[in-house]
């Protein structure tokens, strides 16, 4: 899966995309260094979305905090 740094992966779903945008995260690179547990607390961000985001970050040598 290739995701540009200027967006979020489509596979995370609409609820997760909306929750992340409401929290101010609209780009993949903004998630680097953010604690995964903080993102998991957002309503709409579940295990599947976190896995997809983790994989997309790892493809770029980045990770959650």
Predicted regions, residues:
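Compact, charge-rich alpha-helical regulatory domains located at protein termini
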Residues: 1-65
């Amino acid at each position: 899966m290739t995701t540009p740094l200027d967006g979020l992966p489509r596979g995370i779903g609409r609820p997760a995309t909306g929750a992340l945008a409401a929290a101010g995260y609209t780009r993949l690179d903004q998630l680097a260094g953010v604690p995964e547990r903080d993102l998991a607390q957002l309503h709409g961000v579940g295990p599947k979305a976190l896995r997809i985001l983790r994989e997309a970050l790892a493809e770029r040598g980045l990770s959650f905090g």
